[in-house]
Amino acid sequence: MSAALRFWLRGQSAASNQSSKAPSAAPSPAASSTSLRDQFNKHGRSSTGSVSAAQQEASNIEDAMAAVALIMNDDIDGAEAMLRAREDASTFHQLGVGVSTFLRSILGFEKDIMNEATTRLGETETRAWNDMKKAQKEAEKHGVYGGSVYPQGHPSGGSHIYPPGSEFALVNAEAQLMGAVVAVMHESLTEGIKGFYKLRKAYATLDGIMASELLYLQTLEKKGIITNASSTKTSLDKMPGAFSDSEFATLENTKGANTPSQNGAAADSASVAKDPSGPQTPASASASNEAKTAADVDILDEKLGHLQLDADAASEQNVLPDASLEDTTPSTPQFSHLDQLNKFGADRSLFKSPVDIFVHSGASMCFGILLLIISMVPPAFSRLLSVIGFKGDRDRGVQMLWQSTKYDNVNGAMAGLVLLQYYNLFFGIADILPSELDIQQLSKPSTGGAKFEAVGYPHNECTALLAQMRHRYPDSRLWRLEEARVLANARRIEEALAMLADNNDSKMRQIAALNSFELSMNSIYALDFKAAPVHFLRCVELNSWSHALYYYLAACAELELYRDLFHSGEATSPAALKHKKLAEEYFRKAPTVAGKKRFMAKAMPFEVFVLRKLQKWEERVKAYGLDLADVICVSPAMEMIYLWNGSKRMPPHLLEKARTYLPWERCTAPADKDVVAKIKKLEQDEVAIGLLAESSFLRQLGKSVEARKLVEPLLGVDKSVFKGPTRDDYCGAAAHYEVAAVAWMEACSPEAWPSAPEEVESFRKQKTDECQLHLDKVSKWDGFVLDARFGMRVQAGIDSVKWLKSKKGWM
């Protein structure tokens, strides 16, 4: 669970330990509507006379949403200034301030900001709960139970879909979700446990909101209105797992903020949602202001034109036609606007009032994120999920996120960001994914009439989504970062590097740090070892997430530069000695800055990896009497490419070049001391590292037979060989994963199938079964340092195998 949360929130890297720069002077992005907001001055009071409570609430929602939208345009300071300018700030404004503080805390990972975020979110949680109870009492006073929050006769305001107080229940749930993330990322196990409890309560609240929405849509369907209600089905029959809320009473009582028990918040929201007292009435609508002109489409088409990959572009790069390469270089037809492609879920026109739009888009975004993240939790955490009572649903989670992107507000933007992270990052590290051919042939129409499978990559929709976000938030460097990830995942690594290098001027230091880390890792994948150290040292300046990792990677690059000069006959040249000195300096610096950041009271996995690695090498230094740089054998840079699955981003010529860095002859130990031969004999985990890395390079080149031959001998190595305080304990599990990936590649690549058509199905089933066999072994493997990183790749594989077997009837 922790790895999945970090993955989404950090995007494989850390961010700033400082706040953003000065707010932008550029105009803010448009909110979903300004008609009501314009009627109120900066103090929140009407400029035209008295207004109803419903209209005041609608204005508060729109004003707060418009302010928070500035964050998506790289202006977090401007957002806070706008939110704090209101003298009578509403719950929604308070939520906005909580969101900005939350983002600062998770990006910077500074303890004082995390504590501030915890306090602010706790206050928001309390106020939202109180406002929800107040709204429910107000509704009872006027005899309203299942329709509007406020009395009928205020068509421009309250909800005609959700139970009274649902908008505040949503704010309460959002505050709980953010508070849970901050708690889980705290360096305290107790705080982490409280965080999981908050997640459970938010889960129940959101499911209750979605249940009431489903009833509304079903009512419309009975009237003959097409709504796609089945796509909004509720999943909270009985949450699996069982524990009493009283078990957490002690934890709840230790809070600093005066937060009431939230049993009522979730229970009240869910119970009212599931027992409406009458038919739901659609809200009368104001005209939608989200229609886009043909000129807008042309502009977006031009801006994103270079992302429209086609088969010709792939062939120009000599990308081989194996399954893994096929999935990253699909054909994309002429650009279409997202509105024309996003047919998932209920029609946008069914939600018209500001309150309904806020609740629908927000609940879809929040619940979608929850369902998606829970579905991706590695197998090792399955017992934890059963205790907490969560049930993930990837298909539904992804569909709900696409539903939220239909709305031009910060909820839609956040949903879009999560979707792009899911497709660009999660798919980017996963090897075992359905082929394009299987997706096209086996996908079933969704309720919206479009082909939709959560295990597949919707290229057209993602391109359109990215275009829309860049158009909506033109000053943001966040969306250009995502665009660079799309290029990198298409093996256009040089273009990605150029875009990232030109994207380092974000007003938000946090986003600049994310961009810098992406640039650094892509430099390693591009084998640009001259640029990589500069970029990683820049990461040290920009953020404090894992300086140990940054120094280690900078050292890896310096080591390769030293080796290049050494083997070209310049071992004693000033340049070679400089790179050797820097490599040793950075390697030895890494352990001294490790352990400063912890996650739920545990050391960061890659920092533990670095500590073990340096301990191993220092033992060799003492044993053989050599310099640190000269006792390192298998390329640590190639090992890091393997562990981060960077080979998926590398075009064929770089994959072939990477193989030349793997021979043991690259080691610079004196030949007369026979050091390499001794290490080869004594340290089988070192041998395994080289075989695993080369196997992955061969697999990405489409050479499955050669890849299998390299890695299969590792399956027979006893597990104990890879155990020990300085052993690389991931090698045994990784060997099974590599065989699973090769088997899947053979199952999905037509080039590997038998020539006789009647034998294809049995061959594919056999290879799929083989893949599942090895994935199951990895999922049950004893714990190892990097098990969470492999666990996410394994979970993606398990889901893909399950999907194909289900579609083929092989279950």
Swiss-Prot record:
Sorted UniProt keywords: Cytoplasm, Nucleus, Phosphoprotein
Keyword Cytoplasm: yes
InterPro entries found in the cross-reference section: Iml2/TPR_39 (IPR019412)
Annotated compartments: Cytoplasm; Nucleus
Keyword set includes Nucleus: yes
Region (Disordered): 14-54, 253-292
Low complexity bias spans: 14-35
Gene Ontology CC: cytoplasm; nucleus
PANTHER family: TETRATRICOPEPTIDE REPEAT PROTEIN 39 FAMILY MEMBER, TETRATRICOPEPTIDE REPEAT PROTEIN 39C
Family statement drawn from the similarity comment of this UniProt entry: Belongs to the IML2 family.
Protein known as: Inclusion body clearance protein iml2
Species the sequence originates in: Neurospora crassa (strain ATCC 24698 / 74-OR23-1A / CBS 708.71 / DSM 1257 / FGSC 987)
